[in-house]
């Protein structure tokens, strides 16, 4: 019985160097079906439509128009479009949803674990997220209060669970941690192409979150300099395992100069 739908949204994924192509392929590997909300004027939608055509019957695409995108504001904009995909999956009749962001990849070792987890019929399942920094092969190693985003996120839940806030997690009444260590999501968002990072952060902070001013550290270097935020000698460490296979080629082309 088909019971697990993967969901994802992406807007202008090419412009801001999201690994959305790999993320969609990742969901196809372990989900029964995938719903993608996509848009933008940079070829993102066309690519998603193309991969949907190649996987006929397994992907539904919801078009995000420019007017719809600009009609939402604040960090809740992210959960709004995430929920567009989740609500569509709900209408299709799926029991569970795995929500992945367009700059994330699930490790292939976790595919079977996710399928195992949903057989236990819990409402939701906490997942581990590895936040990469400076290099696709290094991860942040600082206290949670210093991290730019969480290392535990709720992304697997019954289809009634909706995204909230800045879409970091789903909302649920109950959550199990029984599978947390084995469901591993790699966050590539801070290791995009170095010449894209500055504009990406400004776009997110100003155009999405609605901040009056973006982080002033961005003006201290022409190219994004990750060392301005975290000391490479003390604040990062090597990842604990090889990167997910689907992202290895992408990662090899994104090693920073400094």
Residue ranges and their predicted role:
Residues 2-8, 27, 32-37, 185:
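Hydrophobic targeting segments
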Residues 4-11, 19, 37-99:
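Active-site-proximal specificity loops/subdomain of glycosyltransferases
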Residues 8-16, 33-44, 239, 245-251, ...:
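Glycosyltransferases that elongate glycans
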Residues 12-30:
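Short, well-formed alpha-helical segments that are part of the catalytic scaffolds
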Residues 22-23, 47, 112-116:
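A short acidic, amphipathic alpha-helical/loop segment
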Residues 28, 49-54, 115-120:
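Short, surface-exposed basic-aromatic patches at helix termini and helix-loop junctions that form
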Residues 31, 94, 102, 121-122:
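Short, well-ordered alpha-helix to beta-strand connector turns
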Residues 75-86, 105-258:
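Catalytic-site signature of metal-activated, phosphate-bearing donor transferases
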């Amino acid at each position: 019985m088909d019971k697990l739908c993967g969901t994802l949204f992406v807007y202008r994924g090419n412009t801001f160097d999201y690994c959305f192509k790999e993320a969609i392929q990742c969901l196809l590997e372990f989900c029964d079906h995938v719903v993608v909300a996509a848009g933008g004027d940079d070829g993102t939608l066309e690519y998603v439509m193309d991969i949907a055509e190649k996987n006929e019957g397994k992907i539904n695409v919801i078009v995000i128009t420019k007017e719809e995108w600009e009609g939402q504001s604040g960090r809740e904009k992210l959960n709004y479009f995430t929920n567009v995909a989740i609500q569509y999956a709900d209408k299709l009749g799926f029991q569970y949803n795995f929500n992945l962001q367009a700059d994330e990849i699930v490790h292939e070792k976790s595919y079977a674990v996710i399928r195992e987890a949903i057989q236990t019929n819990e409402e939701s399942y906490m997942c581990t997220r590895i936040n990469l920094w400076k290099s696709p092969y290094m991860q942040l190693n600082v206290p949670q209060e210093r991290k730019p985003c969480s290392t535990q996120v709720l992304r697997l839940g019954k289809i009634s669970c909706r995204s909230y806030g800045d879409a970091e997690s789903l909302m649920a009444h109950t959550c199990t941690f029984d599978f947390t260590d084995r469901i591993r999501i790699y966050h590539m968002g801070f290791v995009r192409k170095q010449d894209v990072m500055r504009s990406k952060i400004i776009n997110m902070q100003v155009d999405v979150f609605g901040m009056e001013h973006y982080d002033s550290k961005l003006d201290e270097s022409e190219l994004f300099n990750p060392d301005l935020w975290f000391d490479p000698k003390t604040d990062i460490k090597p990842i604990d395992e090889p990167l997910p296979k689907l992202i290895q080629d992408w990662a090899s082309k994104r090693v920073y100069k400094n």
